[in-house]
């Protein structure tokens, strides 16, 4: 079996639209949560979100290309371009039939859909864009990446809600591991901060209503947490077989060594209260990596800042790691990023790869009064320098989808 490594990364996020800015802000504990100013929030319970700043699609992609794409595909292409450039791969020197794309989105082009529904209702069918369907479909981002890079290998857009990023990375890892591809773009993207989705999540009482202090709203594991903060962006990684990477003397961020997935089989939106599915995904990932729980040095938690979710993930970690759970730093990137939905797993995998490379665990901010049922070491407030060899990253989604990946420091 082939070993699989990460040779390029690209990010679009509320705390930075390149790896350097993103990482520096993450380890400084900078929050990307702001007041929503893209639509009227007067009648909404939640008025805050993690919004990507200073992103000019026309400048990044060109006006013609940007105009026909929904924002979620724009984010994906921008992140993919960064990752490709970072990897130093040369299309003329690789087999494009073994170049794949595994990139998904949880919601797809909802903004474009709503714009066209409004146009249809107000002005009739002639005002509906002929590019509506290819713009809104969840596989649009993967398709656009495939087209741009002439990637003729395996292509897929997994749809596992907020577990998408890890699902995409894990399935791409499997393909390369078993020799069916040399290089794959893998990750997730999302742009769904519109009035309809904020209203829906808000009415489901899933969102934080801490509108008076946005940067304090996302507070995983804190007793005063009151829901997640919706966010947006994209995280794309270049996965490559080690043999392929070594032949071209590529820079390597980290090695992907394990992947596990499971289903809660419990409820369409609520996580299993005892974290059973989360436990199974983590256990499967460690088994797949052929490592013991004692070998894990850091955990990147899903940790969305919901009452039940944070407790159930803590329970799952303690069930799998036993007493060792109290010795492992557990970081919650969503305390700064908010919940990027389908983009979360890809972005958090990038953060974990950087942690392995730099030996720094990002902090969990806003953890001022820990929930008594959340009693692990969550790296509160300040980043920590730690010797890290192996890291585990969790992503869980509506429908009970769970995916965990294991990364290892490459030496």
Question: In which residue ranges do the predicted regions lie?
Answer:
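Conserved small-residue
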Residues: 8, 26, 80, 101, ...
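Active-site-proximal alpha-helical scaffold in enzymes
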Residues: 76-89, 141, 146-190, 228-250, ...
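Glycine-/small-residue-rich "gating" segment that lines the acyl/pantetheine channel
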Residues: 123-129, 167-170, 174, 191-247, ...
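A glycine- and small-aliphatic-rich helix-loop capping segment at beta-alpha/alpha-beta transitions
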Residues: 20-27, 111-125, 175-178, 198-211, ...
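Conserved beta-ketoacyl condensing-enzyme motif
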Residues: 6, 30-160, 189-200, 293-309
